[in-house]
Amino acid sequence: MDIQTRIKELRKQINEANYLYHTKDQPIISDFVYDGLMRELIELETKYPEYDDETSPTKKIGGVVLDAFKKHTHTVPMMSLSNIFNKEELKVFYDRIQKVIPNTSFTTELKIDGLAVTLIYEKGIFKKAATRGNGVVGEDITENVKTIKTLPLQLSKPLDIEVRGEIYMSHKTFKEVNLERANSNLDLFVNPRNAAAGTVRQLDSKVVAKRRLDLFTYTVVGASNFNSTQKETLEFLSELGFPVNPHYKLVDNLDALSDAIDNYDILRKTLPYDTDGVVIKVNQFEHYETIGYTAKYPKYAGAYKFEAEKQITKVEDIIFQVGRTGVITPVAVLTPVFISGSLVSRATLHNEDYILNKDIRIDDQVLVHKAGEIIPEVIEVVLGSRTNQAPFEMVKHCPACESNLVRKQGEADYYCANDNCPGKNVFGLIHFASRAAMDIDTLGEKVVELLHDQTYLQTIPDIYKLHTFKDQLEELPGFGKKKVEKLLNAIEASKMQTLDRLIFGLGIKNVGAKVAKTLLNHYPSITLLADAKYEDLIQIPDIGPEIADSVTTYFSNESNQHMLEELKNLGLQMTYKIDVVTTHPFNGKTFVVTGTLDDFSRTEASDIIEKLGGKVSGSVSKKTDYVLAGKEAGSKLTKALELGIEVMDEATFKVKINE
């Protein structure tokens, strides 16, 4: 057998093994044999580059390292589906469609909890993959998606086709990846979806390949050009070699639809991957235009959302955390329980009133869920299992410094009033260094906690004295010369941050980033702001009595005055200047910023627009000139497209601001 024939034979064997193992769950060769075939193919392709082929399974190994992701404009927007939250809403959805198209049938498909992706093929050869992004513009993640073993690099037919699907990470892989990260002292991923999203955004495709992402496809762009129904489309995708979730069904009445959802709710708890609902679509494509669309969603489809998962567990203890403003938050320490894709061992109890209203006690059995599928929360006590648990009593002293706690009239929270409280200081230091405030790279939560424990950081000015401990810092666990140098450079650079960031970073109660700017627009230096009178502050638009009281209280405190003087002497900016560029193309233009941007927060983008003479509004109207849209942009983007307003993605924004 000649070399070229052997290479083709190896590719065929490996592709067949990949398909049967990853798509059909039917392994035909052992891992040992598979690895041997792959090694042989890699060696032959390396030795004989003239036989290189972009569809070779060796392309899934990874190896391309990118500087950044390129933007990709979708030929057809990747928009969302409307949510259906209960059986009553399901009936409304069903009846509305039946009025337009009587006796229509529906497909039901599991909604995979992952990352949406579009896949582009030319003459049956995989060419490009892109994320959803803001629905109009996504990111090119081709090299990373190539590493997914269930992705066909060559289809069974030479078609020009665009296919959409969901990238996800299995429970097994998720546990393995987090174990590796724990052993490397890295932050753990919160859940498989978070892990999949983080992996897809890796610039090094070798890292992606090691994390073993997976894929399900569910539709074709312009599907009616290939088939007449959604069911046929799913079968068609499978025939082409795409992985398709096998648990789809065809139903023809409301009872069958309701039963299917109930069955999916049972099934999903046994699956090796996460799901977060059921996608329901009218089966016949010919009815889509008749049924129509809203401004944001197609009317012929919806996503039934499973009720938030709840679990019963035990309250082992109630502890108290000190926030950066001194707020004392009670937290339930729970017997660990798996909820919605992650292990939950703590849950917020909000405040004393919340605990007393629900009568939560240590040793109680409680029902826990994730609020918004994110934040663990105790929702009720299982009273039938209670024995002799003592009623909850709020602590009277700060858990960090033992100072007396205070509760202001009309407020639910208790506060530690000690300005030098170490617990408050840790959170205050973390906030000060955060991206939204002074943006000190490398000085994250864990580093702050370590330096605080080692007594290098107790106050904000201590941050700017860390250079005097350079040699000692290099000896700390997880540090070293390069990391310390990077940290100290970031600290030095932060001295040039604008005064509004400093004011926000100080953690003054009720003073967020926007309020800080508003205050400085009227008192453009630390001295002027410190001398501002309560009665003058409340005359400023958007500055009410609570903010005015917080500001005057903060600046009248002698310890705070000394700290600010120290920061001034250390070289931080103490005056505020807005340089409005009246000749810039943004001058006089009204913007709306929506979605999540990669390199800016929405506040940062708004700051740039305003400094270039533009105005930032909170809502889209006919008076809006531009909508700056990031990922997961929702109704504001939809309205902009309806009104014909120019939509600007982040890449264009970066170019424009330098004009």
Curated annotation (Swiss-Prot):
Listed EC numbers: 6.5.1.2
GO biological process: DNA repair; DNA replication
Domain BRCT: start-end pairs: 581-659
Catalysis: reaction(s): NAD(+) + (deoxyribonucleotide)n-3'-hydroxyl + 5'-phospho-(deoxyribonucleotide)m = (deoxyribonucleotide)n+m + AMP + beta-nicotinamide D-nucleotide
Keyword terms of this UniProt record: DNA damage, DNA repair, DNA replication, Ligase, Magnesium, Manganese, Metal-binding, NAD, Zinc
Listed GO CC annotations: cytosol
Cross-referenced PROSITE patterns: BRCT, DNA_LIGASE_N1, DNA_LIGASE_N2
Positions of Zn(2+) binding: 398, 401, 416, 421
Superkingdom, natural source: Bacteria
Record: active site: 111
Binding site for NAD(+): 31-35, 80-81, 109, 132, 166, 281, 305
Entry GO MF terms: DNA binding; DNA ligase (NAD+) activity; metal ion binding
Cofactor list: Mg(2+); Mn(2+)
Known function: DNA ligase that catalyzes the formation of phosphodiester linkages between 5'-phosphoryl and 3'-hydroxyl groups in double-stranded DNA using NAD as a coenzyme and as the energy source for the reaction. It is essential for DNA replication and repair of damaged DNA.
Family the UniProt entry places it in: Belongs to the NAD-dependent DNA ligase family. LigA subfamily.
Protein name: DNA ligase
Organism from which the protein derives: Acholeplasma laidlawii (strain PG-8A)
Gene designation per UniProt: ligA
